[in-house]
């Protein structure tokens, strides 16, 4: 049985070399006339048809696009891997700085610490003597004025109550246990400080110091930091621990004498 010749085109090395040279020279999609000229020229080196030339250029362009696509994908993957490595290397280095920034206290001269008038805080301490250990928003201001401002004494000292001379040491100690150690703060103040203290001096001194700190003149600072009428009232200290006897013995003796007189009658 005779074998039919194959219709598949098998290009010779000379034909492939000529086609590749033409492709490198810039020929990508030849028209019909160019295909006929190329086919006639390549027919000297072997069997070839016009459709073989057309499909060779089409397949060669497709292979080149695939190669370019693979190169671009490999380049993008390499760049992405490098970016990931840089991000992972920079994350541990920046985490201590961020934690230190979060835990760092605000600067002493920064605007984050509110400036509260010491006289207003004195009035707050007078009405809330046991809230000082929980909220102290004016620590930054007091830290700056510690060298010039006289420390605010306890509300009991503002009323010039002489606890040591009044014979109420035992009663103050007992009340200190009930009020969370308040008597310990009272006993820490010396008797000389209690006697020298004047209730009007802290107000004037605070106005002068705050006026100087704000950079204004004496008159401008006093006018700017003038307190309302409720804060200019003199402080009053409640008589929590009475210093005088209640006269129970006299009342008992008088009641006994009256009962005896009624019984004799």
UniProtKB/Swiss-Prot annotation:
Question: Biased composition, Low complexity: where in the chain?
Answer: 254-265
Query: Where are the residues of the annotated region Disordered?
Result: 77-107, 242-265
Location of the protein in the cell: Nucleus
The record, for Gene3D superfamilies, names: Homeodomain-like
Short name of any one Pfam family annotated for the protein: Homeodomain
DNA-binding region listed in the record? 4-68
Main localization, broad class? nucleus
This protein's source sits in the domain of life called: Eukaryota
> Where is it found, in Gene Ontology cellular component terms?
nucleus
Q: Name one GO molecular function term.
A: DNA-binding transcription factor activity
Enumerate the Gene Ontology biological process terms. Answer: plant organ development
Keyword list, A-Z = Developmental protein, DNA-binding, Homeobox, Nucleus, Transcription, Transcription regulation
Task: Please give the tissue specificity annotation from the record for this chain.
Answer: Predominantly expressed in tissues enriched for shoot meristems and young lateral organ primordia. First expressed in lateral domains of shoot meristems. It is then expressed in the margins of young lateral organ primordia. Not expressed in roots, seedling leaves or fully expanded coleoptiles. Also expressed in vegetative shoot apices (five leaf primordia and the SAM) and in the male inflorescence. Expressed at high level in the female inflorescence.
Q: Tell me which InterPro entries the record gives.
A: HD (IPR001356), Homeodomain-like_sf (IPR009057), WUSCHEL-like (IPR044555)
The cross-references to PANTHER family, in alphabetical order and at most eight, read: WUSCHEL-RELATED HOMEOBOX 1-RELATED, WUSCHEL-RELATED HOMEOBOX 3
Q: Function of this protein?
A: Probable transcription factor required to initiate organ founder cells in a lateral domain of shoot meristems. Involved in leaf formation.
Q: Which family does it belong to?
A: Belongs to the WUS homeobox family.
Query: What is the recorded name of this protein?
Result: WUSCHEL-related homeobox 3B
> Whose protein is this, by species?
Zea mays (Maize)
Gene expressing this chain: WOX3B
């Amino acid at each position: 049985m005779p074998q039919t010749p194959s219709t598949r085109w098998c290009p010779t090395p000379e034909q492939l070399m000529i086609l590749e040279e033409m492709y490198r020279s810039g020929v990508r999609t030849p028209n019909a006339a160019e295909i006929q000229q190329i086919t006639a020229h390549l027919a000297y080196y072997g069997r070839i048809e016009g459709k073989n030339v057309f499909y060779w250029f089409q397949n060669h362009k497709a292979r080149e696009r695939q190669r370019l696509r693979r190169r671009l994908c490999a380049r993008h993957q390499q760049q992405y891997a490098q970016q990931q490595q840089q991000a992972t290397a920079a994350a541990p280095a920046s985490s201590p700085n961020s934690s230190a920034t979060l835990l760092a206290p605000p600067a002493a001269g920064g605007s984050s610490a509110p400036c509260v008038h010491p006289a207003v805080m004195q009035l707050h301490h007078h009405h809330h003597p046991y809230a000082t250990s929980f909220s102290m928003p004016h620590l930054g201001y007091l830290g700056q004025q510690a060298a010039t401002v006289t420390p605010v004494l306890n509300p009991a000292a503002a009323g010039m109550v002489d606890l040591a001379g009044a014979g109420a040491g035992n009663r103050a100690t007992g009340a200190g246990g009930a009020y969370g150690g308040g008597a310990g703060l009272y006993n820490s103040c010396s008797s000389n400080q209690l006697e020298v203290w004047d209730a009007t001096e802290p107000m004037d001194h605070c106005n002068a110091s705050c006026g100087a700190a704000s950079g204004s003149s004496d008159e401008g600072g006093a006018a700017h930091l003038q307190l309302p009428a409720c804060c200019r009232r003199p402080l009053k200290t409640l008589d929590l621990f009475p210093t005088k006897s209640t006269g129970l013995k006299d009342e008992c003796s008088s009641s006994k004498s009256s009962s005896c007189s009624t019984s004799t009658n």
